[in-house]
Protein backbone atom coordinates (compact mmCIF):
# COMPACT_ATOMS: atom_id res chain seq x y z
CA UNK A 1 0.00 0.00 0.00
CA UNK A 2 1.26 3.49 -0.80
CA UNK A 3 0.80 6.26 1.75
CA UNK A 4 1.53 9.99 1.78
CA UNK A 5 3.29 10.91 5.03
CA UNK A 6 1.77 13.89 6.82
CA UNK A 7 4.63 14.12 9.33
CA UNK A 8 8.13 12.70 9.73
CA UNK A 9 8.11 9.00 10.67
CA UNK A 10 11.28 7.43 12.02
CA UNK A 11 12.81 4.77 9.75
CA UNK A 12 10.25 5.50 7.02
CA UNK A 13 10.49 9.03 5.65
CA UNK A 14 9.75 12.72 5.96
CA UNK A 15 6.48 14.62 5.63
CA UNK A 16 5.29 14.87 2.02
CA UNK A 17 6.98 11.68 0.83
CA UNK A 18 5.07 8.79 -0.72
CA UNK A 19 6.15 5.46 0.82
CA UNK A 20 5.30 1.83 0.21
CA UNK A 21 4.28 0.10 3.47
CA UNK A 22 2.53 -3.10 4.46
CA UNK A 23 -1.26 -2.89 4.64
CA UNK A 24 -1.47 -3.56 8.39
CA UNK A 25 1.16 -0.95 9.28
CA UNK A 26 -0.43 1.60 6.98
CA UNK A 27 -4.04 1.09 8.11
CA UNK A 28 -3.56 0.26 11.78
CA UNK A 29 -0.78 2.66 12.69
CA UNK A 30 -0.03 5.39 10.15
CA UNK A 31 -3.55 6.21 8.96
CA UNK A 32 -5.18 5.52 12.36
CA UNK A 33 -2.78 7.94 14.09
CA UNK A 34 -3.12 10.54 11.30
CA UNK A 35 0.54 10.29 10.39
CA UNK A 36 -0.31 9.42 6.78
CA UNK A 37 -3.08 9.24 4.21
CA UNK A 38 -3.72 6.68 1.51
CA UNK A 39 -1.72 7.93 -1.49
CA UNK A 40 -4.23 8.57 -4.25
CA UNK A 41 -3.64 11.11 -7.02
CA UNK A 42 -6.31 13.35 -5.50
CA UNK A 43 -4.69 13.30 -2.03
CA UNK A 44 -1.21 13.93 -3.45
CA UNK A 45 -2.38 16.85 -5.61
CA UNK A 46 -4.32 18.36 -2.69
CA UNK A 47 -1.24 18.07 -0.43
CA UNK A 48 1.00 19.71 -3.05
CA UNK A 49 -1.52 22.55 -3.45
CA UNK A 50 -1.61 23.10 0.33
CA UNK A 51 2.20 23.17 0.51
CA UNK A 52 2.36 25.65 -2.39
CA UNK A 53 -0.32 27.87 -0.81
CA UNK A 54 1.52 27.83 2.53
CA UNK A 55 4.81 28.76 0.83
CA UNK A 56 3.15 31.67 -1.01
CA UNK A 57 1.59 32.91 2.23
CA UNK A 58 4.96 32.77 4.02
CA UNK A 59 6.63 34.64 1.14
CA UNK A 60 3.97 37.37 1.35
CA UNK A 61 4.38 37.66 5.14
CA UNK A 62 8.16 37.88 4.78
CA UNK A 63 7.80 40.64 2.18
CA UNK A 64 5.51 42.56 4.54
CA UNK A 65 8.03 42.14 7.39
CA UNK A 66 10.84 43.42 5.15
CA UNK A 67 8.72 46.45 4.22
CA UNK A 68 8.09 47.10 7.93
CA UNK A 69 11.83 46.96 8.66
CA UNK A 70 12.52 49.52 5.93
CA UNK A 71 9.91 51.82 7.48
CA UNK A 72 11.27 51.27 11.00
CA UNK A 73 14.81 52.21 9.99
CA UNK A 74 13.65 55.71 9.06
CA UNK A 75 11.93 56.29 12.41
CA UNK A 76 13.24 58.04 15.49
CA UNK A 77 10.73 57.57 18.29
CA UNK A 78 10.73 60.40 20.85
CA UNK A 79 9.71 59.60 24.42
CA UNK A 80 9.35 62.32 27.06
CA UNK A 81 9.91 61.20 30.67
CA UNK A 82 10.36 62.90 34.01
CA UNK A 83 13.98 62.99 35.07
CA UNK A 84 15.54 63.14 38.53
CA UNK A 85 18.34 65.45 39.65
CA UNK A 86 21.06 62.96 38.70
CA UNK A 87 19.73 62.55 35.12
CA UNK A 88 18.07 59.18 35.61
CA UNK A 89 14.44 58.55 34.72
CA UNK A 90 11.59 58.15 37.18
CA UNK A 91 10.73 54.61 36.14
CA UNK A 92 12.32 52.72 33.29
CA UNK A 93 11.21 52.46 29.66
CA UNK A 94 10.20 48.88 28.89
CA UNK A 95 9.20 46.95 25.77
CA UNK A 96 5.53 47.55 26.58
CA UNK A 97 5.95 51.32 26.70
CA UNK A 98 7.98 51.31 23.48
CA UNK A 99 5.23 49.42 21.61
CA UNK A 100 2.52 51.73 23.02
CA UNK A 101 4.40 54.89 21.99
CA UNK A 102 5.18 53.41 18.58
CA UNK A 103 1.47 52.73 17.99
CA UNK A 104 0.59 56.27 19.14
CA UNK A 105 3.13 58.00 16.90
CA UNK A 106 3.08 55.56 13.93
CA UNK A 107 -0.29 53.80 13.76
CA UNK A 108 0.57 51.93 10.55
CA UNK A 109 3.26 49.89 12.32
CA UNK A 110 1.92 46.91 14.21
CA UNK A 111 4.71 45.65 16.46
CA UNK A 112 4.26 43.33 19.40
CA UNK A 113 6.41 43.61 22.52
CA UNK A 114 7.86 40.15 21.82
CA UNK A 115 9.34 41.47 18.55
CA UNK A 116 11.50 44.03 20.39
CA UNK A 117 14.91 42.95 21.66
CA UNK A 118 15.71 44.99 24.76
CA UNK A 119 18.44 43.54 26.97
CA UNK A 120 17.47 45.73 29.93
CA UNK A 121 15.02 48.59 30.50
CA UNK A 122 16.15 52.10 29.56
CA UNK A 123 16.84 54.16 32.70
CA UNK A 124 18.46 57.37 31.44
CA UNK A 125 18.03 60.01 28.74
CA UNK A 126 19.75 59.74 25.38
CA UNK A 127 19.45 58.09 21.99
CA UNK A 128 19.17 54.31 21.89
CA UNK A 129 19.05 51.86 19.00
CA UNK A 130 16.38 49.20 19.50
CA UNK A 131 16.68 45.90 17.64
CA UNK A 132 13.55 44.26 16.25
CA UNK A 133 13.20 40.60 15.24
CA UNK A 134 10.08 40.02 13.16
CA UNK A 135 10.44 36.34 12.30
CA UNK A 136 11.42 34.68 9.01
CA UNK A 137 14.99 35.82 9.72
CA UNK A 138 13.98 39.48 9.30
CA UNK A 139 15.89 41.76 11.67
CA UNK A 140 15.88 45.54 11.83
CA UNK A 141 16.38 48.46 14.17
CA UNK A 142 15.02 51.89 14.97
CA UNK A 143 16.09 54.73 17.25
CA UNK A 144 14.52 56.01 20.42
CA UNK A 145 15.28 59.49 21.70
CA UNK A 146 14.55 59.72 25.43
CA UNK A 147 14.27 63.36 26.51
CA UNK A 148 13.47 65.07 29.80
CA UNK A 149 10.02 66.59 30.31
Swiss-Prot record:
Keyword line: Ribonucleoprotein, Ribosomal protein, RNA-binding, rRNA-binding
Cellular-component GO terms for this entry: ribonucleoprotein complex; ribosome
InterPro entries: Ribosomal_bL9, Ribosomal_bL9/RNase_H1_N, Ribosomal_bL9_bac/chp, Ribosomal_bL9_C, Ribosomal_bL9_C_sf, Ribosomal_bL9_N, Ribosomal_bL9_N_sf
Signal peptide: none
Biological process according to GO: translation
Gene Ontology MF: a single term: rRNA binding
NCBIfam families in the record: L9
Family membership: Belongs to the bacterial ribosomal protein bL9 family.
Function according to Swiss-Prot or TrEMBL: Binds to the 23S rRNA.
Record protein name field: Large ribosomal subunit protein bL9
Biological source species: Helicobacter pylori (strain Shi470)
